[in-house]
Amino acid sequence: MTEKQFRSGFVSIIGRPNVGKSTLLNRILGDKIVITSDKPQTTRNRIQGIHNLPGCQMVFIDTPGIHRAKSKLNKYMVDVALSSIKEVDVILFLVEADAKPANQEGMILELLANADAPVLLVINKIDLVAKEALLERIAAYAALYPFREIVPVSALSGDGVERLVEVVHGFIPAGPPYFPDDILTDLPERFIVAEMIREKIFRLTHDEVPYSVAVVVESFKERADGLVSIAAAINVERESQKGIVIGKKGEMLKRIGMQARREIEELLDTKVFLELFVRVSKEWSENTRMLKEFGYE
């Protein structure tokens, strides 16, 4: 196969918070590179996942959910999502099968009105609705925007995902691969480790605590015996949040550490010594300097 025949391109996955964008990307790749939880706004950064097929490389971009931003952190997240619409080859607009089009979807469709790339509607969570309801949802969205294709899927079960990849493949232009064919993401290991720790905090804590946390890997060392030693700081905004993350007699921090360490060991394929500590960084989500320091820039 000649280089001209090879196809490669970038595919942006956008939608409001908590519609399953990260779950879909993990399902497409057949591996977990993006953290997930049942809470909205789990994804904060642009995440690139690389899916290789014979003669084709698709770089899928997972983005934060598009919402009305309040804090500087939220504004950063929305800016990341909106910037991903530009200079991509395909846009996947992900919605839920069990929810009617609402104001947030309307706002996103307005943003897509001038998109240069073809926009495909992906209706997720089809396992939650009957066929009649799904057909109604397809008709409702088709009346709102001239989507090039409409593909129903269940990111959780994988139903329809293979067909989605086939449909996307048809829109990928000719070009050489952007990345080697043996990597799933261009993200550094430190970033993925920090995200795995943050995922456990999202899953184990509640209310405002998950949204007030930033994790920074401060030390990442491979020892002579093959064990990897990692030290990470969990930044919160208030003393009360610090107490919640640590928990009674340190039990919550132990749970976070144990669950994160197991996943990190699977990622790195080696034993890991994980040290976590919690510090108060007051109002970091509104502080430009700290946002950059914590990787939100």
Curated annotation (Swiss-Prot):
<dbReference type="InterPro" id="IPR006073">
    <property type="entry name" value="GTP-bd"/>
</dbReference>
<dbReference type="GO" id="GO:0043024">
    <property type="term" value="F:ribosomal small subunit binding"/>
</dbReference>
<feature type="region of interest" description="G1">
    <location>
        <begin position="15"/>
        <end position="22"/>
    </location>
</feature>
<dbReference type="InterPro" id="IPR004044">
    <property type="entry name" value="KH_dom_type_2"/>
</dbReference>
<keyword id="KW-0997">Cell inner membrane</keyword>
<keyword id="KW-0472">Membrane</keyword>
<dbReference type="GO" id="GO:0005886">
    <property type="term" value="C:plasma membrane"/>
</dbReference>
<dbReference type="Pfam" id="PF07650">
    <property type="entry name" value="KH_2"/>
</dbReference>
<dbReference type="Pfam" id="PF01926">
    <property type="entry name" value="MMR_HSR1"/>
</dbReference>
<dbReference type="GO" id="GO:0005829">
    <property type="term" value="C:cytosol"/>
</dbReference>
<keyword id="KW-0342">GTP-binding</keyword>
<dbReference type="InterPro" id="IPR005662">
    <property type="entry name" value="GTPase_Era-like"/>
</dbReference>
<dbReference type="GO" id="GO:0005525">
    <property type="term" value="F:GTP binding"/>
</dbReference>
<dbReference type="InterPro" id="IPR030388">
    <property type="entry name" value="G_ERA_dom"/>
</dbReference>
<feature type="binding site">
    <location>
        <begin position="62"/>
        <end position="66"/>
    </location>
    <ligand>
        <name>GTP</name>
    </ligand>
</feature>
<keyword id="KW-0547">Nucleotide-binding</keyword>
<feature type="region of interest" description="G5">
    <location>
        <begin position="153"/>
        <end position="155"/>
    </location>
</feature>
<feature type="binding site">
    <location>
        <begin position="124"/>
        <end position="127"/>
    </location>
    <ligand>
        <name>GTP</name>
    </ligand>
</feature>
<feature type="domain" description="KH type-2">
    <location>
        <begin position="205"/>
        <end position="282"/>
    </location>
</feature>
<feature type="region of interest" description="G3">
    <location>
        <begin position="62"/>
        <end position="65"/>
    </location>
</feature>
<feature type="binding site">
    <location>
        <begin position="15"/>
        <end position="22"/>
    </location>
    <ligand>
        <name>GTP</name>
    </ligand>
</feature>
<dbReference type="InterPro" id="IPR005225">
    <property type="entry name" value="Small_GTP-bd"/>
</dbReference>
<keyword id="KW-0694">RNA-binding</keyword>
<feature type="region of interest" description="G4">
    <location>
        <begin position="124"/>
        <end position="127"/>
    </location>
</feature>
<keyword id="KW-0690">Ribosome biogenesis</keyword>
<comment type="function">
    <text>An essential GTPase that binds both GDP and GTP, with rapid nucleotide exchange. Plays a role in 16S rRNA processing and 30S ribosomal subunit biogenesis and possibly also in cell cycle regulation and energy metabolism.</text>
</comment>
<comment type="similarity">
    <text>Belongs to the TRAFAC class TrmE-Era-EngA-EngB-Septin-like GTPase superfamily. Era GTPase family.</text>
</comment>
<dbReference type="GO" id="GO:0000028">
    <property type="term" value="P:ribosomal small subunit assembly"/>
</dbReference>
<feature type="domain" description="Era-type G">
    <location>
        <begin position="7"/>
        <end position="174"/>
    </location>
</feature>
<protein>
    <recommendedName>
        <fullName>GTPase Era</fullName>
    </recommendedName>
</protein>
<keyword id="KW-0963">Cytoplasm</keyword>
<dbReference type="GO" id="GO:0003924">
    <property type="term" value="F:GTPase activity"/>
</dbReference>
<feature type="region of interest" description="G2">
    <location>
        <begin position="41"/>
        <end position="45"/>
    </location>
</feature>
<dbReference type="GO" id="GO:0070181">
    <property type="term" value="F:small ribosomal subunit rRNA binding"/>
</dbReference>
<dbReference type="InterPro" id="IPR015946">
    <property type="entry name" value="KH_dom-like_a/b"/>
</dbReference>
<keyword id="KW-1003">Cell membrane</keyword>
<dbReference type="InterPro" id="IPR027417">
    <property type="entry name" value="P-loop_NTPase"/>
</dbReference>
<comment type="subunit">
    <text>Monomer.</text>
</comment>
<dbReference type="InterPro" id="IPR009019">
    <property type="entry name" value="KH_sf_prok-type"/>
</dbReference>
<keyword id="KW-0699">rRNA-binding</keyword>
